A protein has these predicted regions:
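A boundary/linker detector
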Residues: 1-20, 24, 123
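Short, hydrophobic/aromatic-rich segments at coil-to-beta transitions
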Residues: 19, 28-33
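N-proximal short alpha-helices
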Residues: 25-28, 83
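Rieske [2Fe-2S] iron-sulfur-binding domain
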Residues: 32-123
Length: 123
């Protein structure tokens, strides 16, 4: 398992508080889970290559908290999740929608601390 932070959002954050949101064993490879945050929900993904990614769970097109239920894959060499409702693809590392580049999801820094999966939250 790659225990390094898997995205660059941490580089732009002023100060993060790392919050344990689940155990690694709670996320099967190739799937996602939804986690509740103080201000909403995050979609946490574990790829088949054991990389961790975290995005906002709120789908801006269907207006439902369903991104964590999307299918993981790749398009044009980019790792993506397909929304389960209208099938838009969001890049796991940037949150950008491939079908509408004016739309993006918040990306959360994520890391593995032992067997705890942690999100970096600015609070």
């Amino acid at each position: 398992m790659n225990s390094a932070v898997s995205n660059t959002a941490v580089n732009n954050a002023m100060e993060l508080k790392w919050r344990s949101v689940c155990r690694l064993q709670d996320i099967l490879p190739g799937t996602g889970v939804g986690v509740r945050l103080a201000t909403g929900q995050a979609a946490l993904f574990r790829t088949r290559e054991d990389e961790l990614f975290a995005l906002d769970n709120h789908d801006p097109f269907s207006r439902a908290n369903v991104i964590s239920r999307g299918l993981l894959g790749s398009l044009g060499g980019r790792k993506v999740v397909a929304s389960p409702i209208y099938k838009q693809h969001f890049c796991l590392d940037s949150g950008k929608c491939l079908e509408d580049e004016g739309v993006s999801l918040t990306v959360y820094p994520v890391r593995l601390n032992g067997q705890d999966v942690e999100l970096g939250l600015s609070e």
